[in-house]
Design a protein with these regions (language model features):
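Carbohydrate-binding surfaces of carbohydrate-active enzymes
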Residues: 1-275
């Protein structure tokens, strides 16, 4: 999961299509939706070392420099799996808008060309409050008007709403082959629930397992110390007690009760074990 403070600052200026959408919100929605499928994502700065991950998400990364563009292209060409959302690649690092449509310098990587945006909500008379998708997800606040889809790309989901919106049947989620890798473009703000609903098809199109190895009720994070010791943090994500097996020696616990080889973690509870 790529995060970029400069993209957050850029997305806050008043020249954007809507003031309801900022970069900082989108990584959190994707992180939570992935966790709902048992996948714990690492959050890495845009200049960090994300090139070796099996899958990378660019969630509304508003600014794409030429250097980041090169890294993205090399990553996918080399076999990486990339997910890109709306509001990505609008401008370069100096906030100069990329010409020719969006997502700017990586249009061919994702196989789409976005020509304009549809902001939504009661701040904009004559536009819908939301848009439905063919998979049952609902888009809020903003949707991309995808003007063209490359021949190498396949539309996974379309918008499905009243014809007067002008978006009924338009592409919403598109997958593309680029080099040895694949990409998925998500052209709307779907929120946690809509992302979670769309992830099985996204995973399948990228050739990945639909769920991760972790219990979706528990956020599991591993950290390794300088001496090689490994610590596992297990957080209860639900409003009910969750029972999990004890891994290693419990060194810290909060709102948790051990019973034999299992531990019951109450809501807001956490345990830390040393392996």
């Amino acid at each position: 999961m790529v995060f970029d403070y400069e993209s957050e600052w850029a997305s806050e200026h008043t020249a954007t299509p809507t003031q309801k959408v900022h970069h900082v919100d989108e990584p959190l929605q994707w992180f939570r939706a992935l966790a709902d499928h048992g996948v714990t994502a690492d959050v890495v700065p845009v200049r960090g070392a994300w090139d070796d991950y099996e899958m990378v998400v660019l969630p509304s990364v508003y600014l794409l420099s030429e250097e980041t563009t090169r890294r993205v292209r090399d990553y996918v060409v080399g076999g990486g799996r990339l997910v890109v959302t709306y509001y990505t690649g609008i401008s370069d690092e100096k906030d100069h808008v990329w010409l020719g449509g969006y997502p700017g310098s990586i249009r061919d990587v994702v196989g789409v060309r976005v020509e304009e945006f549809m902001p939504m909500g009661d701040d904009f008379p004559g536009v819908p409050d939301c848009l439905g998708l063919s998979n049952g997800a609902v888009a809020h606040d903003i949707a991309d008007v995808i003007g063209s889809v490359d021949g190498s790309a396949t539309v996974l989901e379309t918008f499905k709403d009243d014809p007067w919106t002008g978006m009924d049947g338009a592409p919403a989620i598109v997958t593309n082959t680029f080099g040895e890798g694949r990409s998925v473009y998500v052209g709307a703000r779907l929120g946690r629930d809509g992302i979670a609903k769309s992830l099985p098809e996204i995973f399948e199109s990228l050739g990945m397992a639909e769920t991760g190895e972790n219990d979706s009720r528990v956020l599991r994070v591993e950290r390794e110390g300088a001496d090689g010791s490994r610590f596992v943090f297990s957080f209860n994500r639900t409003h009910e007690a969750v029972q999990i097996p004890v891994e290693g020696k419990i060194v810290v616990s909060s709102f948790a009760e051990v019973s034999g080889e299992n531990v019951s973690i109450k809501p807001n509870g956490v345990i830390v074990t040393k392996q």
